[in-house]
From Swiss-Prot:
Subcellular location: Secreted
A cellular component term, taken from the record's GO annotations: extracellular region
One GO term (biological process): neuropeptide signaling pathway
Organism: Austrophasma gansbaaiense
The family this protein is said to belong to: Belongs to the periviscerokinin family.
Protein name: CAPA-Periviscerokinin-1
Domain of life: Eukaryota
């Protein structure tokens, strides 16, 4: 997913 765009990693 867009992990780099979020302020936290979606697990």
């Amino acid at each position: 997913e867009a992990a780099g765009l979020l302020p936290f990693p979606r697990l």
